[in-house]
Amino acid sequence: MKEFWQTCVSRLEQELPPQQISAWIRPLVPLAYDETQAVLRVAAPNRFKLDWVRKNFSHQIEALAAEWFQRPVQVAFELPAGGAGPRMPAVPRTPAGAPAPVSAGMAATPAGAPAQAPVAPAAVAAAVQADAAGVVYERSRLNTDLTFDNFVTGKANQLARAAALQVAENPGISYNPLFLYGGVGLGKTHLIHAIGNAMVAAGTGVRVRYVHADQYVSDVVKAYQRKAFDDFKRYYHSLDLLLIDDIQFFSGKSRTQEEFFYAFEAMVAQRKQIIITSDTYPKELAGIDSRLISRFDSGLTVAIEPPELEMRVAILLRKAESEGVPMPEEVAFFIAKHLRSNVRELEGALRKVLAYARFHGRDVLSVDVCKEALKDLLSVSNGQITVENIQKTVADFYKIKVADMYSKRRPANIALPRQVAMYLAKELTQKSLPEIGDLFGGRDHTTVLHAVRKISDARAKQAELNHTLHVLEQTLKG
């Protein structure tokens, strides 16, 4: 077993960067090989390493094990049971320039070979101790399932992905801060986790923290209650990468914004990377200090749009593949054509279809199965776009009352949404200008025409407004 594992690590050293070998492969410890089941048991020092190695390196290790044992082998990764630890120490580092162990076609150890003797407790402790990369994962709160490899790219998000890759490769230099904005379920959270995972996987021992804005607020409150602001500042200022999700939740929380401003200034001054997500463009954030908004604008701001048809199909096919379910393209196209708003909705629809198929014993996914499983969703998405639907959708988006669409009030926070709704009513329905005016509280057709022209002109000049209109159009089209 020892000879096999040394050879396995040596072969992997020829395929993987040194940082990945140090961070992920060397801490692994082979436990035993079950000849009856053809299962190789391998221990990882902690849950984070186990999940990462299983997802990223299991196929390579299984291929090398199959070559050595001359049969297909399944690798079972596990944690040391009961604290007893593995029975063999991790493979020591090969000295620079030392030749890799050579074997005749990776010939297997004879079945009757004596078992390895137990190692000293010190070796066991060393084998299970998490190295720097493992500690980073434990503290980072990163989701290891969200990587660049499984992020589906299309026109809607290709610029955001390119910027994210650049930041992952050159943190603190290229775009700092990186500000990603877009509607719910479009992949913002996936992308920032992918950046963090890529930096940790590089094995450089970076200090990373993913935190939702609500959790950051909670951290500030706890620091205030415990009179521990020095510790709070010391921790956040020491990070190499800070990922803040949904920063719009900082709205109205002045102490939180103040502490974040100090952390922002300290990190940027040291060329430490900050990445922020929001549901809206920085200048449209309500209740956020102007100092912070100016800092957000100082880096790169990128929008993530709702996915186009081809991208929605690709997302469905990728998700079905990850579930181990073959999906014909015609089925993916059927779902994608009827559900257009965001990735989360697509994945939810797919889960509903799969659950329906399993419950009813349908082995093959078909368009008919989708129609049956999604009939409630399809009845909504197939409905005609009406002025009433537009008014409700726009009111929900801008967080105003539908009644404000008909009222005579004209404050800016109501006038703009009302004009947007009039513009969309003209673009997306067959109603005439007088008919639209009647549905907006009996307004004259010239008022509607003025709103349509104003929004049309502004859309061509303002990227934020264009993005907002695109999101609303995609939502209304279903």
UniProtKB/Swiss-Prot annotation:
Keyword ATP-binding: yes
Subcellular location: Cytoplasm
Cystine residue pairs: none
InterPro entries registered for this protein in UniProt: AAA+_ATPase (IPR003593), Chromosome_initiator_DnaA (IPR001957), Chromosome_initiator_DnaA-like (IPR020591), Chromosome_initiator_DnaA_CS (IPR018312), DnaA_C (IPR013159), DnaA_dom (IPR013317), DnaA_N_dom (IPR024633), DnaA_N_sf (IPR038454)
Gene Ontology annotations of biological process type: DNA replication initiation; regulation of DNA replication
GO CC annotation terms, alphabetical: cytoplasm; plasma membrane
Region (Domain II): 71-140
Region annotation (Domain I, interacts with DnaA modulators) ranges: 1-71
Chain residues that bind ATP: 185, 187-189
Spans annotated as Domain III, AAA+ region: 141-357
Annotated keywords: ATP-binding, Cytoplasm, DNA replication, DNA-binding, Lipid-binding, Nucleotide-binding
Any one GO molecular function term: lipid binding
Main location as per UniProt: cytoplasm
Ranges for region Domain IV, binds dsDNA: 358-478
Domain of life per record: Bacteria
Free-text comment about domains: Domain I is involved in oligomerization and binding regulators, domain II is flexibile and of varying length in different bacteria, domain III forms the AAA+ region, while domain IV binds dsDNA.
Stated family: Belongs to the DnaA family.
Function, in words: Plays an essential role in the initiation and regulation of chromosomal replication. ATP-DnaA binds to the origin of replication (oriC) to initiate formation of the DNA replication initiation complex once per cell cycle. Binds the DnaA box (a 9 base pair repeat at the origin) and separates the double-stranded (ds)DNA. Forms a right-handed helical filament on oriC DNA; dsDNA binds to the exterior of the filament while single-stranded (ss)DNA is stabiized in the filament's interior.
Quaternary structure and partners: Oligomerizes as a right-handed, spiral filament on DNA at oriC.
Protein name per Swiss-Prot or TrEMBL: Chromosomal replication initiator protein DnaA
Species in which this protein is naturally found: Bordetella petrii (strain ATCC BAA-461 / DSM 12804 / CCUG 43448)
